[in-house]
């Protein structure tokens, strides 16, 4: 009978023979590995691809397979996340840490997917700015804060913001908000819209220009 060592819920054999490889009932993409008739661990099909019944295997080999499987599972978790939308590398790292993934595995996955261009902070920053410009216009200051929170470095943020049309963004925001204070005297209306745009991070010179433009555009035509 081979010696056995157990840790993290897995029992590893110092040396044993693979006696069965069976697909898991609930997840046929994973394989249960049995050594000398006893369950040892479960592996992704791709990780278990080189194993065969009757093969002798050591504890260190099983530990390497277990590590490869952890990396595979973390990678698959990230790929499912990326199917929703792009994410920055820092967002991915935080996401995996929340799922108790080891730091070395996190770095391995990020490096692998960055090399494959599936994680790309430059592309993510451009995507984020374009989405905001299309659906929820923001000032450069607000966009910079959002990208900083997502862990994007300053140089990448600056490049992504270089083409932002802040005047157009402020105009669209002002047009959307203008009706909230319809009927107020001009001075009060201007003050409210000015404060609102300033809170959104737009520079005063742009705010002043846009407030006047939107006020005039909302006045009834004189006959």
Give residue spans per PLM region.
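An alpha-helical, amphipathic repeat domain used for nucleic-acid recognition
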Residues: 10-223
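N-terminal amphipathic/hydrophobic targeting modules at extreme N-termini
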Residues: 1-10
């Amino acid at each position: 009978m081979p010696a056995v060592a157990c840790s993290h819920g897995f029992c590893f054999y110092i040396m044993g023979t693979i006696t069965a490889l069976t697909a898991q009932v609930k997840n046929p993409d994973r394989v249960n590995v049995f050594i000398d008739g006893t369950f040892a661990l479960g592996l992704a099909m791709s990780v278990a691809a080189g194993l065969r019944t009757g093969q002798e295997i050591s504890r260190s080999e099983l530990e390497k397979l277990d590590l490869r499987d952890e990396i595979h599972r973390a990678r698959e978790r990230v790929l499912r996340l990326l199917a929703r939308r792009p994410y920055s590398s820092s967002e991915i790292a935080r996401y995996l840490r929340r799922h108790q993934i080891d730091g070395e595995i996190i770095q391995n996955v990020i490096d692998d997917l960055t090399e494959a261009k599936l994680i790309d902070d430059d592309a993510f920053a451009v995507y984020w700015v374009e989405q905001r410009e299309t659906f929820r216009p923001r000032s450069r200051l607000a966009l910079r804060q959002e990208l900083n929170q997502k862990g994007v470095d300053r140089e990448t943020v600056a490049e992504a913001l270089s083409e932002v049309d802040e005047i157009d963004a402020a105009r669209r925001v002002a047009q959307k908000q203008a009706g909230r204070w319809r009927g107020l005297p001009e001075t009060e209306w201007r003050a409210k819209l000015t404060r609102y745009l300033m809170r959104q991070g737009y520079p005063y010179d742009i705010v002043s220009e846009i407030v006047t433009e939107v006020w005039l555009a909302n006045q009834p035509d004189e006959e």
